[in-house]
């Protein structure tokens, strides 16, 4: 069966040139039909898909799409609720209690730059003050992309684009991972102290 598989890449540099090879065709004498692998990046603007040579032919020649997740599963209320709970710090912990005074000041400086407000604002503190460093890292990355990445829209993604294409054409969509696995990898597999270090790397 012809398949389009989306592989997320952690390298922004892959998207600095339309000439970078992001689409691969897999074929061979023992395969009845080819499959395609596309390298994607969550923070790349969806408009970039038009710069990937061969994408229209690949989409028109596939019978199913396989992504990191089935995006429809991710949008279900129960999945959103699970994610929100996983992003919270353990009871009694706050970001302020985890960071030194100097680190907290540096974090506030970045927040002020990105949102024109910091943790001294009750609304900002209520939104960010009790989430894990990893969750805040993700939120800050989105805010940075909104501010600096031309054409970035957090409501659209490569995965969503390809999966919607498949569903419009009545093709199956497969997720490589479950929502629970994503939560485990993103928010539970990294110790809090290491999350803090990664957060401060982003801040600095």
Predicted segments with their positions:
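Sec/Tat signal peptide C-region and signal peptidase I cleavage site
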Residues: 15-20
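Sec-dependent N-terminal signal peptides
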Residues: 4-14
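Structured, acidic catalytic/metal-binding patches in enzyme active sites
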Residues: 25-35, 41-204
